[in-house]
């Protein structure tokens, strides 16, 4: 992944931050907030347009985040709009912004001191301000009324990666940044063309500059721009709107993603962390959700463990795995912290330490470190630093995830479902095994057969983990199943000193003070897909610890002889990435794309997918780190909202990706 550098800045006599990279102020020395309101809010006709807006979500795009002043100002105005117009159709504000050199958190806080009236908003932003990790970071605020998608990286690289469909995405553009004379690399026709691609019809745009080449470039891109009075002593600025948008999308036909055409009622089949996170984000969007779970309560499957590690799955630079799991982990932190304000579940951000316990693991971790990840995310520790970090004697180097930790997935999942059941938009049907799905073309409804009863829904999401093969629409998905057994060991005086989750050829968690046990695991068994206790797995879990950390007496204190354990079956993919999105019609795709290798990209028809049927599967061992963000991805797709991952990363999550890859190579997919 391309490393992100924080902004280098100074502060002038007026206390205004000044960029060292661009030798320009971040906002006006005098009345910076009033200038923002005049240039970007008023010239985009806000809040007047909000009163007339007939959709649930209004989307603003901004070309330079900087200190976040524009975002904070529009957030303040939108909250006032919500208070004054509680019955308006518009309920949510979505702000998409780009920043090549993000401010450090310390500099951001200092800059925000200039606007005391925005302090309550600034503090909420600061709480979830992301580490300097490339690409999109979604921040959900005000229980979903405000969403910020903050893209870190060069705008010329990031903007084409923002997913959009034929209708466009942006309702209003804030064309902001350092002055064109200070940052000529940004202000060019490529930028204006990309703004047009993302714009909806009638999208407005405003910018502080009156430079002729900017006005002409925006006009050429399809906007109708004009000069208007500038703020204060500035004579002119320019503003306008999209005159005629060309219909286009940046989703490849064979990886097409479509929203649901009918959101009247959404069914989720499952009962684990994926289902709970998805239900929460859909209900937050005002959707009616019914959960169908085959068990007596949530989290009886793979999400039922006492302790699960939360840290990102990273590997070499520029891989789909790293580009999914780095932002997903940061969003999981946000999700967990927000959930902890409302429900009780055991968790501890104690860090995660991954040991370089042999040559192979050392080579793998050294290669991972070549990804130039932010030290806020991961850093290498010497043997001495490792021992100090974990609190136990050890003589090997490691990599440490300082923001990682552990949580109780069973308590989190059940807490989320219990919280949702208090709302009028959610219903859970336990002991309801969905045995079949049938699409009624005439009525455009799905019929779910469960326990001999039929239930009708307009949209269905299959999130039932290793049970995916029980439904004909998802049984062909190329996923595997792996049994895992986690062992529980009682605390000892020495083991209670462990201060970090420890990963090697297995993992061990610190002692949970609420039950005085730790977890050690987990086995991988593809041959026995049952939920029975396995003596060999119980023994192997301890033996792996002793093998990887030899000559340390404390490893011998891990006692699993009481046979305390838990079994689960993971749903896994070959490429370690989940399946999130529309469910493809396997039999039809085989015929539709039989000659795909010989077709030009522009000739390919959109992949055939079941109407209003989606899946959320294959989370493997990393559901705690990935489920919250991927739930956002899927809920956003279903509802037609902006998606929080780059468009080429979304292809790596497409449920039909493995079929398409084979077909493009001229290979048959009959044996998948």
Swiss-Prot record:
Q: Which Enzyme Commission numbers does its entry carry?
A: 2.1.1.61, 1.5.-.-
* Protein's GO biological process: methylation; tRNA wobble uridine modification
InterPro entries (alphabetical): FAD-dep_OxRdtase, FAD/NAD-bd_sf, MnmC-like_methylTransf, SAM-dependent_MTases_sf, tRNA_MAMT_biosynth_bifunc_MnmC, tRNA_MNMC2, tRNA_S-uridine_synth_MnmC_C
Residue numbers spanned by region tRNA (mnm(5)s(2)U34)-methyltransferase: 1-243
Q: In its keyword annotation, does this UniProt entry include Cytoplasm?
A: yes
Q: Which superkingdom?
A: Bacteria
* Reaction(s) catalysed (UniProt annotation): 5-aminomethyl-2-thiouridine(34) in tRNA + S-adenosyl-L-methionine = 5-methylaminomethyl-2-thiouridine(34) in tRNA + S-adenosyl-L-homocysteine + H(+)
Keyword tags: Cytoplasm, FAD, Flavoprotein, Methyltransferase, Multifunctional enzyme, Oxidoreductase, S-adenosyl-L-methionine, Transferase, tRNA processing
Subcellular location per UniProt equals: Cytoplasm
Q: Which cofactor names does the annotation list?
A: FAD
Location of region: FAD-dependent cmnm(5)s(2)U34 oxidoreductase: 269-672
**Any GO MF annotation of the entry:** flavin adenine dinucleotide binding
Matching entries from SUPFAM superfamilies are given as: FAD/NAD(P)-binding domain
Its Gene Ontology cellular component terms are: cytoplasm
NCBIfam families (UniProt xref): MnmC_Cterm (TIGR03197), PRK01747.1-2 (NF002481), PRK01747.1-5 (NF002484), tRNA_MNMC2 (NF033855)
Instruction: Name the PANTHER family for this protein.
Output: SARCOSINE DEHYDROGENASE-RELATED (PTHR13847), TRNA 5-METHYLAMINOMETHYL-2-THIOURIDINE BIOSYNTHESIS BIFUNCTIONAL PROTEIN MNMC (PTHR13847:SF283)
**Function of the molecule:** Catalyzes the last two steps in the biosynthesis of 5-methylaminomethyl-2-thiouridine (mnm(5)s(2)U) at the wobble position (U34) in tRNA. Catalyzes the FAD-dependent demodification of cmnm(5)s(2)U34 to nm(5)s(2)U34, followed by the transfer of a methyl group from S-adenosyl-L-methionine to nm(5)s(2)U34, to form mnm(5)s(2)U34.
Q: Please name the HAMAP family in this protein's record.
A: MnmC
Concerning its family, UniProt says: In the N-terminal section; belongs to the methyltransferase superfamily. tRNA (mnm(5)s(2)U34)-methyltransferase family. In the C-terminal section; belongs to the DAO family.
Q: What is this protein called?
A: tRNA 5-methylaminomethyl-2-thiouridine biosynthesis bifunctional protein MnmC
Look up and give the organism this protein is from: Vibrio parahaemolyticus serotype O3:K6 (strain RIMD 2210633)
């Amino acid at each position: 992944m391309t490393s992100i550098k924080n902004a280098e800045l100074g502060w002038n006599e007026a206390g205004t931050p000044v960029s060292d990279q661009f030798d320009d102020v971040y906002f006006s020395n005098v009345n910076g907030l009033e200038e923002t309101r005049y240039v970007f809010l008023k010239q985009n006709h806000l809040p007047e347009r909000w009163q007339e807006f007939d959709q649930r979500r209004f989307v603003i795009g901004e070309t330079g985040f900087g200190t976040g002043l524009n975002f904070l100002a529009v957030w303040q105005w939108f909250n006032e709009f919500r208070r004054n117009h509680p019955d308006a159709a518009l309920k949510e504000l979505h702000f998409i912004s780009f920043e090549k050199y993000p401010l450090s958190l310390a500099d951001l806080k200092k800059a925000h001191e200039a606007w005391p009236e925005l302090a309550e908003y600034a503090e909420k932003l600061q709480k979830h301000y992301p580490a300097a990790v490339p690409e999109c970071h979604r921040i959900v605020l005000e229980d979903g009324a405000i969403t910020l998608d903050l893209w870190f990286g060069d705008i010329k690289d990031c903007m084409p990666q923002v997913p959009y469909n034929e209708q466009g995405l942006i309702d209003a553009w804030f064309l902001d940044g350092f002055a064109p004379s200070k940052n000529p690399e940004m202000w060019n026709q490529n930028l204006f063309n990309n703004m047009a691609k993302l714009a909806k019809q009638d999208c407005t745009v405003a910018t502080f500059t009156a430079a002729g080449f900017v006005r002409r470039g925006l006009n050429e891109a399809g906007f109708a721009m004009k000069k208007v009075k500038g703020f204060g002593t500035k004579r002119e600025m320019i503003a306008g709107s999209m005159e005629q948008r060309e219909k286009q999308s940046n989703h490849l036909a064979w990886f097409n993603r479509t929203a649901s055409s009918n959101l009247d009622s959404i069914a989720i089949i499952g009962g684990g962390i994926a289902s709970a996170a998805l239900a929460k984000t859909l209900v937050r969007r005002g959707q009616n959700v019914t959960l169908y779970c085959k068990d007596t309560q949530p989290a009886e499957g793979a999400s039922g463990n006492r302790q699960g590690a939360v840290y990102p799955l990273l590997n070499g630079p520029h891989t789909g795995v790293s580009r999914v799991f780095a932002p997903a982990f940061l969003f999981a932190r946000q999700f967990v912290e927000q959930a902890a304000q409302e429900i009780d579940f055991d968790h501890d951000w104690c860090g995660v330490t991954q040991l370089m316990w042999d040559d192979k693991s050392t080579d793998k971790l050294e290669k991972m470190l070549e990804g130039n990840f932010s030290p806020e995310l991961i850093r290498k520790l010497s043997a001495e630093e490792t021992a100090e970090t974990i609190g136990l004697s050890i003589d090997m180097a490691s990599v440490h995830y300082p923001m990682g930790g552990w949580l109780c997935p069973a308590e989190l999942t059940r807490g989320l479902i219990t919280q949702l059941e208090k709302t009028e938009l959610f219903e859970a049907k336990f002991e309801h095994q969905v045995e079949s799905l049938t699409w009624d073309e005439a009525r455009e409804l799905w019929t779910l057969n469960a326990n001999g009863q039929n239930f009708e829904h307009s949209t269905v999401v299959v999130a039932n983990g290793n049970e995916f093969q029980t439904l004909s629409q998802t049984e062909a998905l190329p996923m595997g199943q792996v049994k895992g057994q986690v062992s529980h060991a009682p605390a000892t005086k020495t083991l209670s000193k462990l201060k970090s989750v420890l990963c090697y050829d297995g993992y061990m968690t610190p002692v949970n003070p609420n039950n005085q046990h730790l977890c050690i695991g987990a086995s991988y068994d593809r041959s026995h897909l049952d939920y029975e206790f396995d003596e060999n797995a119980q023994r192997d879990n301890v033996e792996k610890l002793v093998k990887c950390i030899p000559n340390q007496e404390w490893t011998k204190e891990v006692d699993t002889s009481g046979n305390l354990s838990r079994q689960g079956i993971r749903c896994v993919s070959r490429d370690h990435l989940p399946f999130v999105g529309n469910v493809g019609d396997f039999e039809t795709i085989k015929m539709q794309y039989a000659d795909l290798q010989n077709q030009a990209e522009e000739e390919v028809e959109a992949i055939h997918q079941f109407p209003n049927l989606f899946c959320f599967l294959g989370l493997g061992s990393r559901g705690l780190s990935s489920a919250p963000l991927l739930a956002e991805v899927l809920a956003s797709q279903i509802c037609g909202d902006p998606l929080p991952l780059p468009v080429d990363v979304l292809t790596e999550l497409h449920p039909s990706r493995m079929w398409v890859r084979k077909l493009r190579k001229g290979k048959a997919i009959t044996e998948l």
